[in-house]
Structures are given as C-alpha cells and as structure tokens.
A protein has these predicted regions:
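Specific transmembrane alpha-helical segments of multi-pass solute transporters/efflux pumps
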Residues: 10, 15, 45, 49-97, ...
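Glycine-/small-residue-enriched transmembrane alpha-helix faces in small-molecule transporters
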Residues: 1-34, 71, 144-171, 191-195
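Hydrophobic/small/kink-forming positions within alpha-helical transmembrane segments
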Residues: 12, 16, 70-75, 79, ...
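Hydrophobic/aromatic residues within transmembrane alpha-helices
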Residues: 21, 32, 36, 84, ...
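Loop-to-transmembrane-helix transition segments
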Residues: 1-7, 35, 55-80, 150-158, ...
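Membrane-interface helix termini and inter-helical loops of multi-pass transporters
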Residues: 16-27, 83-86, 135-148, 197-211, ...
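Hydrophobic transmembrane alpha-helices of multi-pass small-molecule transport proteins
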Residues: 44, 107, 116-138, 193, ...
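Helix-helix packing/entry segments at the starts of transmembrane helices
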Residues: 32-35, 74, 78, 92-99, ...
Length: 289
C-alpha cells in the first residue's frame, strides 16, 4: 500500500510542474511533450531490454496493439492534457482528469455490453454533478471563461483517451505483464511526439532557460518514469479497488499544492464539486467487501 501512496503523490506533481514551465517560459505543448517523452525514453528502453527474454513472446499483432495503445494512452492523452493545462488550473484539471474510472464504466457498457449496477449509476450522477459545479463556477462570459471551458474540454478528452487505453489494454496487460506493457507502449509512443516536434517546431524551440530544462528533466523522470512503474507494481500487489481508493489522494494533493505554490484560485464551489467527483469515483471504483 505504501507503494501506491508514493506513486500517486509523486504522479500528482506532474500538472504542477507543467504549470511551472508555462509560467517560467512560453513553451508550446508540442515542445514540452517532446522533452518529456524523449528524456524518459532511455529509461523505458532500459526496462524493455531488461525484460527482453520474458514470456510469452509478442506476436506482430501484439506489437501493433501495444503501439496503438501507447499512442492513445501516453502520447495523445498527455498532449491533450498539456494543451488543456494552458487554460485551466492544475487542481481543477486533475479533478476533471480523475473522471477516467467513470469513463471506463461508460466505455465498457457501450462497447463490451457490461451493464452498470445501480450503485455505479448513482456514482455517475454524483460525479458529473460535481463536474458541473466545477465548470459552472468558471463558465462566465468573456474570453477568459471561454478559454477555461476550452481547456476543460481538452483535459476531459485526455481523460477519455486514458480510459480507452485502460479498457482496450486490460486483456493484453494480463497476458504479457504490466511492466512489459508499460515499457513497450511508452517507448513506442515516443515516436509520434518526436516526429510531431520536428515537423512543427524549429530547432530554436529547444533554446530554453536552464530552469525549464530542469523542470522537464524532473517531469520526465520523477513524475513520469518513477510513478508509472511504482503504480504498476502497486496495482499488482494490492489490486484495483484499494488502488482506486488511494488514487483519490492525487487530485486532493494537486488542489492543495497548486493553491499554495501557484496561487491558483480554488473556490468553495469548486471544492464542493471536487468532493463530489472524488466521492463518485470512489463509489464506482471501490467494490463492497
């Protein structure tokens, strides 16, 4: 359980680092994603090499699935999140991103025909009531309100992509193991980020202040590589229900630290909405004993 707590808290610092980068220097999401993924790539390749003799061996179809899931769950979800964080605070952004367990439920119902229980439907109503409160507190007129809603939409799309990644990758993870799946999918997902950067951005985009490079290195290692493998091991040890319960620490810690460290406004209405989101997600994630 200690691993799950550490992994969740470490991972929760990611949006704060992203916001610190944006405050420090006008870095584009394309450049920031390139830095994060290219710096983390050697670590994923090292783990992939270490696990190279593991069974079962992957077929060509397996590799195609791993690549597609890495694209959806790591590249696309991260890119959308980075875009959204330009317009919404780190705390609010995490609360929206934390919707992914409820989206997993909806995707499973629509495509796998798994009917939700009454308890799960109740959780959905509570969760999205919380989201409505969070968004309504910022849904005022003018450019600022429109940009906030745009950012919230991007973060929601990120959550949807991540939920799709979890649903589609469930069977493959069970067959090849979480560590192999994480290392392979994350490594392969780096390719589109690299191609995107060299197509869109000039090399001068990498002429960044030292502080930005430090943030990028910490973002790639401390809040990406480290928590991904810690959480994978924790999930294997304690199971999904307990892991989901501990995962509630994430948006709470981000809301507190972003309010203190980034001077982000977090209103009483947003706090109430956030509490409803967390309660609803826990209701849908934690099974009755």
């Amino acid at each position: 359980m200690a691993l799950a707590v550490v992994g969740t808290l470490v991972f929760s610092f990611r949006p704060i680092l992203v916001k610190l980068v944006y405050v420090t220097y006008p870095v584009s999401p394309v450049t920031l994603l390139f830095l994060r993924m290219s710096i983390s790539l050697p670590f994923f390749l090292a783990v992939a090499w270490w696990l190279r003799g593991s069974e079962p061996r992957l077929t060509a179809l397996d590799w195609a699935k791993v690549a597609a899931l890495g694209f959806i769950g790591y590249y696309a979800a991260s890119f959308l999140d980075f875009i959204g964080l330009q317009y919404v605070g780190a705390g609010v952004g995490r609360l929206i991103l934390y919707l992914y367990p409820t989206l997993v439920l909806l995707i499973s119902f629509l495509f796998l025909h798994r009917r939700p229980t009454r308890r799960q439907l109740t959780a959905l109503v509570i969760t999205y009531a919380g989201v409505t409160l969070i968004l309504s507190s910022q849904a005022h007129g003018g450019a600022e309100g429109k940009l906030f809603m745009l950012g919230a939409l991007f973060v929601f799309a990120s959550s949807l992509f991540y939920a799709t990644y979890l649903v589609a990758g469930g069977e493959l993870v069970k067959r090849i193991g979480s560590m192999r799946f994480t290392a392979y999918s994350m490594a392969l997902a780096t390719l589109p980020a690299v191609v995107q950067f060299f197509v869109i951005e000039p090399m001068a985009a990498l002429e960044l202040p030292t502080k930005v490079w430090i943030y990028a290195i910490v973002l790639a290692t401390f809040t990406t590589v480290l928590p991904l493998f810690i959480q994978a091991e924790a999930l294997k040890r304690i199971g999904a229900p307990e892991f989901a319960l501990i995962g509630a620490l994430g948006p709470v810690s981000v809301a507190i630290t972003s309010a203190l460290g980034l001077d982000e406004r977090f209103t009483a209405v947003q706090a109430l909405g956030g509490a409803l989101v967390i309660f609803g997600v826990l209701l849908v994630s934690v099974k009755r004993s």
